Regions:
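Conserved beta-strand-loop-beta-strand element in the redox core of flavoprotein oxidoreductases
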Residues: 94-108, 220-236
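Rossmann-like dinucleotide-binding cores of NAD(P)H-dependent redox enzymes
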Residues: 70, 162, 166-217, 317-325, ...
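Mid-to-C-terminal Rossmann-like scaffold of FAD/NAD(P)H-dependent oxidoreductases
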Residues: 3-14, 285-378
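Glycine-rich dinucleotide-binding loop and its adjacent helix/turn
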Residues: 117-173
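A conserved beta-strand/loop element that lines the FAD pocket in flavoprotein oxidoreductases
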Residues: 80-95, 207-216
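FAD-site-proximal beta/loop scaffold in flavoenzymes
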Residues: 130-149, 225-230, 236-305
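Short hydrophobic core segments
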Residues: 17-18, 108-118, 239-247, 303
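Beta1-alpha1 glycine-rich phosphate/pyrophosphate-binding loop at the start
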Residues: 3-83, 169-190
């Protein structure tokens, strides 16, 4: 290590980031906007390529090959941002006492360390789960690209935000799609069932077989005819592809191994600092104020705040009310604020092509909303009315 990367106490000045997803790359960009000279090292198990993750929900209808998703190679990103990149370098552990990141390629000291380790797609524990495909990264898409492009019969497990987007996208390309969920309605973690009725109709009109209230029991190989899929109610079907879209689980192994405080995610304070004063976390791996925030806007705002903190100006993360967009073209939805809870009173305006639904608390104050179909223009005026 050169003397230029050490402070007066002989400790590394380098900011080391573990991970190369959206959170890691957004942080690097935010740091570089503020400081052109700060030493930054990014360590990642993959190539570090830059791509737009939300595009994964629409690759089938757009006929987009996995390679075409890449906007910038990892090496070009590193050159553009003037950082040291260690691609294909899995991190084996962290030694907080010595401020070292341990890898098969050696030990790397840090002044401040940022965990941007992301989250992994959840795979249900059932016979044949190894046959499930996940689409949580460009790399996962590349690994299954051939099977995805050839599949005509597709079962999507999980009717959450990503599952609904995938199902509608694949059905719009002429695939025979089954969308399966244990809950009684799609988007059950986000919305009451009544407000999903237009989306259910749109999915079915697109050709999706929406089957709520039942789960997946097992997947068996069926030589020459894809997979034999058994549902929890005993029904059996043949599928060419089974996709798991039942949510994400933060990657916590490195944080746990380093002795950091974790619950559902890596626990951080308002400055995104972990239980170790020299280690921070950002993105899908983080639990902030009791919440997991697997959306892009909190990551962008978090990266901006964390960059200032890392460079010596502590800047607490502050999140305004944020829109969640469900990109289902036949019936898109946008929502914000509190949209689930038995204490909410809903005021709904419907027409044949859209809806505006306002959630009010027991004091009658607006606390959340959903807009759908052709009513997208109502979202921002309502967003401005939500309490901050």
């Amino acid at each position: 290590m050169s003397a230029a990367t050490l402070n007066d106490a002989g400790i590394s000045r380098e900011i080391v980031v573990i991970g190369s997803g959206f959170a890691a790359q957004q942080l690097v960009k935010s740091l570089r906007k503020l400081d052109a000279e700060q030493p930054i090292r990014l360590i990642t198990a993959d190539s570090g390529d830059e791509y737009n993750k939300p595009d994964l929900s629409h690759v089938v209808s757009r006929g987009c090959p996995a390679a075409a998703m890449i906007r910038l190679s990892g090496s070009d990103f590193a050159e553009q941002q003037r950082i040291a990149l260690l691609p294909h370098c899995p991190v084996l552990g962290i030694d907080p006492a010595r401020r070292l990141v341990l890898t098969a390629q050696g030990e790397f000291p840090y002044g401040k360390l940022v965990l941007a380790t992301g989250a992994s797609a959840i795979r249900p524990e059932l016979p044949g789960s190894e046959h499930l495909v996940t689409l949580n990264s460009q790399q996962e898409y590349a690994a299954s690209e051939g099977a995805i492009q050839q599949a005509r019969r597709i079962l999507v497990l999980g009717a959450g935000l990503i599952g609904c987007e995938l199902a509608m996208d694949m059905a719009s390309d002429g695939r025979e799609v089954t969308l399966l969920d244990l809950a009684d309605s799609p988007l059950s973690a986000l919305l009451p069932a009544t407000l999903t009725q237009p989306l259910q109709q749109a999915l079915r009109s697109q050709g999706v077989s929406l089957q709520c209230g039942t789960g997946l029991a097992r997947i068996d190989a069926q030589p020459g005819d894809g997979w034999r899929v058994t549902l929890s109610d005993g029904r059996v079907s043949s599928q060419d592809l089974v996709i798991a879209a039942i949510g994400l689980r933060p990657n916590l192994a490195l944080a746990r191994g380093a002795g950091l405080a974790v619950e559902r995610g890596i626990l951080v304070d308002d400055n995104l600092q972990t239980s170790d004063p020299h280690i921070f976390a950002l993105g899908d791996c983080v639990q902030w104020r009791g919440q997991l925030l697997p959306f892009l806007q909190p990551i962008v705002l978090g990266a901006n705040a964390l960059a200032r903190t890392l460079l010596g100006t502590p800047t607490p993360l502050s999140l305004p009310p944020m829109l969640v967009k469900v990109k289902t073209p036949r019936y898109p939805l946008q929502l914000a604020g509190r949209t689930k809870g038995e204490d909410l009173a809903w005021q709904c305006r419907w027409n044949s092509h859209g809806m505006v639904a306002e959630a009010r608390d027991q004091a009658g104050e607006l606390c959340g909303f959903v807009v759908g179909g052709d009513q997208m223009s109502a979202a921002f005026p309502l967003l401005r009315q939500l309490p901050r």
